[in-house]
UniProtKB/Swiss-Prot annotation:
It catalyses: L-glutamyl-tRNA(Gln) + L-glutamine + ATP + H2O = L-glutaminyl-tRNA(Gln) + L-glutamate + ADP + phosphate + H(+); L-aspartyl-tRNA(Asn) + L-glutamine + ATP + H2O = L-asparaginyl-tRNA(Asn) + L-glutamate + ADP + phosphate + 2 H(+). NCBIfam families: gatB (TIGR00133), PRK05477.1-1 (NF004011), PRK05477.1-2 (NF004012), PRK05477.1-4 (NF004014). One of its GO terms (molecular function) is ATP binding. Coiled coil: none annotated. InterPro entries: Asn/Gln-tRNA_amidoTrfase_suB/E, Asn/Gln-tRNA_Trfase_suB/E_cat, Asn/Gln_amidotransferase, Asn/Gln_tRNA_amidoTrase-B-like, GatB, GatB_C_1, GatB_Yqey_C_2, Gln-tRNA_amidoTrfase_suB_CS. Pfam families: GatB_N (PF02934), GatB_Yqey (PF02637). Allows the formation of correctly charged Asn-tRNA(Asn) or Gln-tRNA(Gln) through the transamidation of misacylated Asp-tRNA(Asn) or Glu-tRNA(Gln) in organisms which lack either or both of asparaginyl-tRNA or glutaminyl-tRNA synthetases. The reaction takes place in the presence of glutamine and ATP through an activated phospho-Asp-tRNA(Asn) or phospho-Glu-tRNA(Gln). This is Aspartyl/glutamyl-tRNA(Asn/Gln) amidotransferase subunit B. Its EC number is 6.3.5.-. Keywords: ATP-binding, Ligase, Nucleotide-binding, Protein biosynthesis. It comes from Lacticaseibacillus casei (strain BL23). Belongs to the GatB/GatE family. GatB subfamily. Heterotrimer of A, B and C subunits.
Length: 476
């Protein structure tokens, strides 16, 4: 029996604001517990929330970037449930009329493109965080309580773990490019809930779905879904029934484990939030936000390929983050060759960032200085070997590469009038190497070049050296 898989993803993205969704408390990651709160976050009686317009605007921005239809008149709802990290005993969200509907993203898996529909996206507040300590007590940190979120709910168009991975990666890039969120899973600013079901091919209704928790990376999402897909297929092939469950991914055991059985849908008793007014979104507001959106990553990739001849793979790497993409474009705008700029950013720059565990904005390197160094290589002022020394300087210090090269005497020696006497001296002292080369031993030329580079402290231009060397050997 063959099966088809249906996957639905709910992605919570933390919006990049200075204050919370319905209170003036600051939003700052990594602070001491319960220091970023006020009476609204704690749910004290009589306090009233107010809508963070900036957060709602970021939500619209995400919706437009995902090609969604923005709801012109909407309202917030109360989602009622009790949990220690939710002191109000309800969450303010959007249920009846979400911020946006009918969006889509285009993914690519194994060279094939596919559109994945987005059923809806809505703005809501985050809950706090429970902390279970070794002393046997559980503590509640409400710093996160009230942080603005946009929840993005996919349509059941995803049919494999690989498509789910591609969808999340594409979604992350699109949202990150808008600037609405930094979408860092390690800091909790992007979280994923998954639902998966399988059914025999040809069966019209969906199979019974299971939800998977504890998915802390895109790789965990892909691996967890792959395991659950096989587990459900095995249950059905053995004649059993798949139960509606919530399961937990164990990354060490590489399997999903049962957390609880769900016998029915949760009843959250939604009703309109009485303490907040409706939200009216004008067409001008939508148009202004649309005009402010940067070019999305897919369009940038295509432009790099068509305008600058960047290979498709390289263009994909350069558009992994907006920071890298903007830096690349700024470097080219400063006069650097696009392919060389791409090579340096993908090679030496990325290598340094990974080794130091820092981001591009945390180092001293500027587009102007990288472009300056690339131009020094291009015009022969420095060699590729010397460029690595220059690079180490300009990525760690705010140093002008041209000025530094001249101060340190690193200018490449390319003048034939200065190189010829040095080469002649080397040849005079190495007649055996000349004879070996003429006898067909090509490695002899490498020895001679090495001697010349040693004599010039590595500053001789290898291309010019080879030209003069061959000419001089011919005359002997």
């Amino acid at each position: 029996m063959n099966f088809e898989t249906t996957i639905g993803l709910e992605v919570h993205v933390e919006l990049k604001t200075k204050s919370k969704m319905f209170s003036p408390s600051p939003v700052t990651y990594g602070q001491e517990p319960n220091t970023q709160t006020n009476v609204i976050d704690w749910g004290f009686p009589g306090v009233l929330p107010s809508i963070n317009r900036g957060a709602y605007q970021l939500g619209i921005m995400v919706g437009l970037a995902l090609h969604a239809d923005i709801t012109r008149l909407t309202h917030f709802d109360r989602k009622n449930y009790f949990y220690p990290d939710n002191p109000k005993a309800y969450q303010i969200t959007q249920s009846e009329k979400p911020l946006g509907t009918n969006g889509w993203v285009e993914i690519e898996v194994d060279g094939k493109k596919k559109k994945i529909g987005i059923a809806e996206l809505h703005v809501e507040e985050d809950a706090g965080k429970n902390q279970h300590e070794d002393d046997g007590y559980s503590y509640v940190d409400l710093n996160r309580q009230g942080t603005p979120l946009v929840e993005i709910v996919s349509k059941p168009d995803i049919t494999s773990p690989e498509e789910a991975y591609a969808y999340l990666e594409t979604l992350r890039q699109i949202v990150q490019f808008t600037g609405a969120s930094d979408v860092k899973m390690e800091e909790g600013s992007m979280r994923v809930d998954t639902n998966l079901s399988v059914r025999p091919i040809g069966q019209e209704h969906f199979g019974t779905k299971t939800e998977i928790k504890n998915l802390n990376s895109f790789v965990h999402v892909r691996d967890g879904l792959a395991f659950e897909e096989k587990r459900q297929q095995a249950v059905l092939l053995s004649g059993g029934e798949v139960r509606q469950e919530t399961r937990r991914w164990d990354p060490d055991a590489k399997e999903t484990l049962l957390m609880r059985v769900k016998e029915g849908a949760d009843d959250y008793r939604y009703f309109p939030e009485p303490d907040l007014p409706p939200v009216a979104v004008s067409q001008k507001w939508i148009d202004d936000i649309q005009a402010s959106l940067p070019q999305p990553p897919a369009e940038r990739r295509q432009r790099y390929i068509e305008d600058w001849g960047i290979p498709a793979y390289d263009a994909g790497v350069l558009t992994q983050t907006k920071e890298m993409s903007d830096f690349f474009e700024a470097t080219v705008a400063q006069g650097a060759d696009a392919k060389q700029a791409s090579n340096w950013l993908m090679g030496e720059v990325s290598g340094f960032l990974n080794a130091q565990h820092v981001e591009l904005g945390q180092v001293a390197l500027t587009p102007a200085h990288l472009a300056g160094m690339i131009k020094l290589i291009g015009d022969g002022t420095i060699s590729s070997k010397m460029a690595k020394k220059v690079f180490k300087e300009i990525i760690q210090h705010d140093t002008d590469p041209d000025k530094w090269v001249h101060e340190k005497g690193l200018i490449q020696l390319s003048d034939p009038a200065k190189l010829t006497p040095i080469i002649d001296e080397i040849l005079d002292n190495n007649q055996q190497s000349i004879d070996d080369f003429k006898a067909g031993k090509d490695r002899a030329i490498g020895f001679l070049v090495g001697q010349i580079m040693k004599q010039t402290h590595g500053q001789a231009n290898p291309k010019v050296v080879n030209q003069i060397l061959m000419a001089e050997i011919k005359q002997r």
